[in-house]
Amino acid sequence: MDVDRVHVDELSPEMIKVRDYVPEYAVIAHRGSTFWTPEETESAYRWAREIGADYLECDMQVSKDGVVLALHDDNLKRTTNIETVFGETLPREIRKNYYMKIGYSETEAEEKVKADEANFVPNLPAYYTYEELLMLDAGSWFNNENLEEALPGLAKEKQYISTLEDLIMYSKGYRLIRDRNQPGMPRQYSIVGKTGETITSLSGTADIVKYDFGYEIDPVWEAGNKNIPGIYIEFKEPWLNPKGFEQIVYDVLANTQDMNIIEKPEPEDTPFYINNGTINVGNTNGKVILQTFSLESLVRVAEVFQGKVPMCFLLWKGTGATDLTYDDPLGYASFINLGVKYKAHFIGPCIAGAPNDYPELDQPWQDYLIHRAKMKNHPYTFDTYDQMAKYFGQYNFGVADGMFNPPYLDALFTNHSDMSINYMITHGWRKSPASQTLVDAREVLRKLGYLDNN
């Protein structure tokens, strides 16, 4: 069946309105950056904000005590020093002191620790309190594995596993308050106490605990363009997070910097760019985009957010339960139709090419099908100039006629926001009022202090 004959459902006018909350050709900083910085840390998100990305992207998980994390891996070994800090066992004394700190007697705390030990799985984030996760270093691995891009500043300024609240605050021009006179410059935080609610996840049922985190205006942001990017946040597979996780995220957005536009919408005429190119996406109704690969998560997000917040249905070709198995027009259209049915505004297909060599799900005819549904196309993940040139149509994609016109995207996830922004400015795709100034990744790292040996 050809692409003109296959049936695709279309977004309603109401859904199109929400779709258009998002700027055209938005640059989405995938995990902040996986190339220049340790992913999903303060350094990554400060860099992406200052380089001029339109969105800061993260994956979401949750700690044992209900703190929403900005964290990709479900095994902490790759991006932290957990093997050195905790090994394969539950940190018994730390956990016991934590329970006493939030109001349990010593006897009660001991019983709770025994129950936790009986159900403990090492290295999985859901089995650790956020206080325990704060003891991990989420930045040193980057220097060990990336000698050419190593950042001397990480040796003096410890990088933490970020929270969703952290991500929001970075997007608003803040940085962590740190004790800059202590080794590692530890972040400021306190445990307020139990909220009275519980959370049931892989690690069992636990108290939700309120933390108070310290933030301050970032002097680099204040001296610069004062960019306010949006955030693009991913719901992982439902087995990884607790039932009701979508509502937890809804509430965090509502209670942090007015990020939930259902609760507090912005004026519809708020511009995406101001003051000669300053990013202002984070002050518009496009300030948050939701995303997921999981059909089950897509359904749950639709129930909670009702299609009133921009949403992307991500595609992967494979044999998993909700993977795209057949990438012919009929199979591809079936996933587009699921996206329309469950209130997604965008499709996010993977792209081919080094270094990831993902399957190709953003061929010209596939982009055409997405647009037939009146959805828009947010492919992932751009790493090279060659990929930018290919999907923006700079060279022939193998299309013999003029039916499928480039570019084959409406926004893009990138690990190199600097490269993507510079390509788009140079080739006329990033137009005024967005900034027309080419960016330098290392200069931004220098301003942030991450190239400083002192």
Name these PLM-found stretches.
Residues 1-454:
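Phosphate-group recognition and catalysis centered on beta-loop-alpha active-site segments
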